Amino acid sequence: MKEQKWIHEGLITESLPNGMFRVRLDNEDLILGYVSGKIRRSFIRILPGDRVKIEVSRYDSTRGRIIYRLRNKDSKD
């Protein structure tokens, strides 16, 4: 049986070593996020100020996996 996860949106506030980021969720929680394997393999660059989708386990709500980088409205990428 697959583990149930919550999916939230948030803003990257700080970049940490080894692909870790501090993420402020839309509900104002501050959690630690790490980059998923697909994003790492695709060389998608994540910088502070980016909006992301993050998958949070029900058992440990202080850590999450970044699964998608949302497009910024003002950037040209």
From Swiss-Prot:
Could you tell me which PROSITE patterns the record lists for this protein? Answer: S1_IF1_TYPE (PS50832)
What CDD domains has UniProt attached to this entry? S1_IF1
> Which SUPFAM superfamilies does this chain map to?
Nucleic acid-binding proteins
Q: Major place of localization? A: plastid
Name the InterPro entries for this protein.
NA-bd_OB-fold, RNA-binding_domain_S1_IF1, S1_domain, TIF_IF1
Q: Where in the cell is it found?
A: Plastid, Chloroplast
User: Record keywords: RNA-binding included?
Assistant: yes
Q: State the Gene Ontology terms under molecular function.
A: ribosome binding; rRNA binding; translation initiation factor activity
Name the coiled-coil region(s): none
Q: Which UniProt keywords apply?
A: Chloroplast, Initiation factor, Plastid, Protein biosynthesis, RNA-binding, rRNA-binding
Oligomeric and partner information? Component of the 30S ribosomal translation pre-initiation complex which assembles on the 30S ribosome in the order IF-2 and IF-3, IF-1 and N-formylmethionyl-tRNA(fMet); mRNA recruitment can occur at any time during PIC assembly.
NCBIfam families attached to this UniProt entry: infA
Query: Tell me, what does this protein do in biology?
Result: One of the essential components for the initiation of protein synthesis. Stabilizes the binding of IF-2 and IF-3 on the 30S subunit to which N-formylmethionyl-tRNA(fMet) subsequently binds. Helps modulate mRNA selection, yielding the 30S pre-initiation complex (PIC). Upon addition of the 50S ribosomal subunit IF-1, IF-2 and IF-3 are released leaving the mature 70S translation initiation complex.
Provide the family line: Belongs to the IF-1 family.
Q: What is this protein called?
A: Translation initiation factor IF-1, chloroplastic
